[in-house]
Amino acid sequence: AVLQMTAHGLVAGAMFLLVGLLYERTHTRNILDYSSLVRVMPRFALFMTITLFAAMGLPGTVGFIAELHAIIGGFQEWGNLMILLGMSILIGTAYAMRTIGMLFTGPVKPQMRDIEDLKLYELVAAGVLVVAIVLFGLWPTPLINLSTATMSQMSDIISQSIQ
């Protein structure tokens, strides 16, 4: 659960930041107003795609590690019910792929031709989150060790207070 919360914080934080930066430039929330942003905002497109891949639970991202641990832990407790609950991952994946397709493919719409790509300070802010998403996806050991140690200490504190 700690891994899932950490992954969610990183992915949701990056997604809200990137969507906010896009809205700041375009002043529209309608996804139908966008297309082929990869041509006019390539850095934004890269960061948003990695973030959406993490939301899907793609291997190599923190989303995969978190979902894998949640499914394995849940399967040990609830068995085949987790297979049914795993369908939500497929629904989320379909949503993310549709979002990628609508934002980054098709012809460039005239009103989107002059959108400015991410500025340096925006790159740094989004980059920190995206690097953490990938780093913890490729090397989750520090995060797992930290959460294991913390949970062990919490368990000791609770068991001592019960006695």
Predicted segments, located by residue:
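The feature identifies polytopic integral membrane transport proteins across all domains of life
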Residues: 1-2
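Long, well-ordered mid-to-C-terminal structural blocks that present hydrophobic/aromatic surfaces
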Residues: 5-6
